[in-house]
């Protein structure tokens, strides 16, 4: 093999290795930023991973909101019409947050099945609800024989 071919082969191998490392780093970064959506029924069935950041969406269950008197900690239940999941959040809730309203909570599921949320997003209209949440609410209503709970709240 001539020195020129040897140099080209080394350059090509270095380039292929660099591209491989770049792709591996990009995939690792994307893996850490993916937040999969789970409905309360999926969480109750054990389909959601523990101690991994997830998104959970549904309607805030009427009568479930509990506020700590000496802090910003709140606890409430979200439902898809079939199952309920408790959510604990330390922080200021969005202005549009209220019972019966659609929300998406981002956080980690603990061993007791409670979502320890670090972010709560309130939805004021079904048009802004993630498709997964709307589908879960419609599916829950069909299972329970009721009307879909994804109707907008006035």
From Swiss-Prot:
Residues in compartment: Cytoplasmic: 1-8
Record-annotated membrane-spanning stretches: 9-29
Gene Ontology biological-process annotations: cytochrome complex assembly
Chain positions recorded as heme binding sites: 124, 128
Localization in the cell: Cell inner membrane
Entries under SUPFAM superfamilies matching the protein: Heme chaperone CcmE (SSF82093)
Keyword Translocase listed: no
Membrane topology: Single-pass type II membrane protein
A GO CC annotation given for this chain: plasma membrane
Entry keyword annotation includes Chloroplast: no
Periplasmic compartment segments: 30-154
An example molecular function term from Gene Ontology annotations: metal ion binding
Purpose: Heme chaperone required for the biogenesis of c-type cytochromes. Transiently binds heme delivered by CcmC and transfers the heme to apo-cytochromes in a process facilitated by CcmF and CcmH.
Name of the protein this chain belongs to: Cytochrome c-type biogenesis protein CcmE
Organism classification: Bacteria, Pseudomonadati, Pseudomonadota, Betaproteobacteria, Burkholderiales
């Amino acid at each position: 093999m001539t020195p020129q071919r040897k140099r080209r082969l080394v350059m090509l191998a270095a380039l292929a290795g660099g591209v491989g490392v770049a792709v591996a780093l990009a995939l690792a970064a994307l893996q850490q930023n993916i937040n999969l959506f789970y409905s309360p029924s999926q969480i109750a069935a054990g389909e959601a991973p523990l101690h991994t950041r997830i998104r959970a969406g549904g309607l805030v269950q009427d009568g479930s909101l509990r506020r700590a008197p000496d802090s910003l900690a709140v606890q409430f239940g979200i439902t898809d019409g079939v199952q309920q999941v408790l959510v604990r959040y330390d922080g200021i809730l969005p202005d549009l947050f209220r019972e019966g309203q659609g929300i998406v909570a981002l956080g980690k599921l603990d061993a007791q099945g409670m979502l320890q949320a670090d972010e709560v997003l309130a939805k004021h209209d079904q048009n802004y609800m993630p498709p997964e949440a709307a589908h879960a609410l419609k599916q829950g209503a069909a299972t329970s024989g009721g009307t879909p709970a994804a109707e907008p709240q006035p």
